């Protein structure tokens, strides 16, 4: 999908690998927690500046440390061209394709801020392979076709978000025609104020989505 010029990876220990794919449009970085052949894969889409950590004081890497196991992988995606929606969606699609070739059967997609739109579009593109989508302080731009998302949708937002107000999550729910919105009082765009609550919520919600997809 990306016409790579070269790819290299290194083992970081603790079941983590860093994979770099070089293309004419930039470098795609993947921080891969868990086995390469996992059947259940969590794709984590960064905000508009890229990176691996996600919101809430490193939620994505925390989930990688706690959820990755024998049949589950958590992959943090650092885009080739941050803030470019079409290119970032292709980055997630290429990552999902890599996972499927290695044995993946279902996905949960997470996205923060700009990455919320990437996650929703990726969930739509994955179709029956998508077990769920969760967004954190999402933007509404780029979510115009959210009604195509068949998987469960969870939209999490800080009430004190001054970058993208919580009305953005309500707009996306309206566009999707489904989904659950949770607004956290006292939390801003990075949701650091409710980091522990989000970690606990995701530690339950993600396995539930995989289990429901597996049996349904």
Annotate each predicted stretch with a short phrase.
Residues 25-27, 35-69, 76-78:
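Short, surface-exposed "cap/lid" segments of acyl-processing enzymes
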Residues 165-174:
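Short alpha-helix in the alpha/beta-hydrolase fold that links the catalytic acid
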């Amino acid at each position: 999908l990306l016409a790579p010029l070269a790819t290299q990876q290194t083992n970081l220990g603790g079941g983590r690998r860093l994979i770099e794919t070089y293309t004419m449009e930039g470098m795609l970085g993947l921080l891969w927690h868990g086995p390469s052949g996992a059947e259940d894969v969590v794709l984590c889409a960064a905000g508009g500046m890229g990176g691996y950590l996600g919101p809430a004081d490193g939620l994505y890497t925390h989930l990688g440390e706690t959820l990755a196991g024998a049949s589950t992988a958590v992959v943090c995606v650092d885009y080739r061209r941050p803030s470019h929606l079409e290119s970032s969606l292709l980055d997630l699609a290429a990552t999902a394709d890599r996972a499927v070739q290695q044995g993946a059967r279902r996905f949960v997609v997470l996205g923060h801020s700009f990455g919320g739109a990437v996650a929703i579009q990726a969930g739509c593109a994955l179709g029956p392979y998508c077990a769920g989508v969760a967004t954190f302080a999402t933007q509404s731009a780029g979510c115009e076709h959210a009604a195509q998302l068949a998987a469960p949708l969870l939209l999490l937002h800080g009430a004190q978000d001054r970058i993208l107000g919580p009305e953005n999550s309500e707009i996306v729910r309206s566009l999707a025609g489904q989904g659950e919105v949770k607004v956290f009082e006292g939390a801003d765009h990075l949701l650091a104020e409710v980091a522990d609550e989000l970690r606990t919520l995701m530690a339950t919600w993600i396995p539930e989505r995989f289990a429901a997809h597996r049996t349904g």
